[in-house]
Amino acid sequence: LGLCQDNKPMCKEGFIMSATKYVGKMYTAERVCSMLNISSEGLQDLVQNNMVLRLTNNHGQEGYPVFQFDNESINPDVQQVIKILLGGGYDPMTVAFWVYRPSELMDGMNTIEYMADSQDNKDFMIALAKQDVANLQANF
């Protein structure tokens, strides 16, 4: 995440401007709170309960991947996958890659696009997330 001269994230309309190319654009906490009409404590609760994905860079700056939101609210399908993966022990950046990056397994689509294509695809991705968690836990 980039910094302005005053060491604050570079923002425009609630977006952190230099979000990585790997997980897409990010919202600031302020933007998410405004969009969801919740307090910062409410947002913290959503993060702690694995309902919203928050990423933190090496400088301690936080961002919320835009891909988990749809029409000014949390995308429930994406939220379900995020909750499964975070709850199963995956770190937030791995979850972001899992959800956002296109895969040949999904005909070159990312998880969000693939789940939106059909109920069968959504069911498949939820089952795959659960299987990945089971595999992770079996190996630790």
Q: What are these model-derived regions, one by one?
A:
Residues L1-F140:
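Non-transmembrane "mature" sequence context
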